[in-house]
Design a protein with these regions (language model features):
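Targeting-peptide/extracellular-domain and disordered-appendage signature
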Residues: 1-170
Length: 170
C-alpha cells in the first residue's frame, strides 16, 4: 500500500486513493477535438467516495458542441487502476496515456494519442502541483498527462462514425 501511495506522488497522473475508504474524489479529464473541429468531447473517468463510505465509479461525457453532459455510473468494484502507471479501467472502458477505449451505451471506439507534450517534472516538483505534491491528505490532486497531443482513431457516437484522425487532444 505504501509503495502505491509513494508512486502516486512521483507519478501524479496515477491513482491516489490507495487505502482511502471515504471522503475522496479523483477524476481524469480527456479532451478530444476532430480535425475539422465539428466534434469536441471531454471524457472524465473517476471515482467518488462520500463521508459515509458510499463509493461509485463513473464516466462523465461532455459534448462541447451540443453543450450537453451525460453521467454513466458504475459500481466502485468496476474501477481498476494500475498501481505503477497511468492506466484506469472501468468495466470495458480503458484510459491511459496511450489511448482510450470506450464501450458506453451510445459511444464506442478507440482513440490513440501521439506526440504527447508532457508537463516537466523533477525530484522536488514531480508535477503541476509542485511541492504541494508531497502534502498528505490534500482534498484534490492534479496531474497532467499531456498538454497537447495528436489523435488517431474513431468513435461511433449515437450510431454515427466520427473520425478523430489528425485531431487534437489534451
Amino acid at each position: 500500500m505504501i509503495f502505491k501511495r509513494i508512486n502516486a506522488v512521483f507519478n501524479p497522473e496515477c491513482y491516489h486513493g490507495w487505502g482511502i475508504n471515504k471522503r475522496f474524489f479523483e477524476g481524469w479529464y480527456f479532451k478530444i477535438i476532430s480535425s475539422d473541429q465539428n466534434f469536441a468531447y471531454a471524457f472524465i473517468p473517476g471515482i467518488a467516495m462520500d463521508k459515509n463510505g458510499k463509493k461509485q465509479s463513473f464516466i462523465q461525457v461532455l459534448d462541447g458542441k451540443k453543450l450537453t453532459s451525460d453521467y454513466h455510473k458504475f459500481n466502485f468494484n468496476d474501477f481498476k487502476p494500475s498501481s505503477y502507471s497511468f492506466d484506469v479501467k472501468i468495466l470495458n472502458n480503458k484510459f491511459s496515456d496511450q489511448n482510450m477505449i470506450l464501450d458506453l451505451p451510445n459511444i464506442k471506439g478507440k482513440i490513440s494519442f501521439g506526440d504527447l507534450f508532457r508537463w516537466p517534472s523533477n525530484l522536488f516538483s514531480p508535477g503541476i502541483m509542485g511541492p504541494y505534491s508531497f502534502v498528505p491528505f490534500m482534498e484534490c490532486y492534479h496531474g497532467i498527462i499531456s498538454m497537447n497531443h495528436n489523435l488517431s482513431g474513431s468513435l461511433k457516437i449515437n450510431n454515427k462514425d466520427v473520425n478523430f484522425n489528425n485531431g487534437k487532444g489534451y
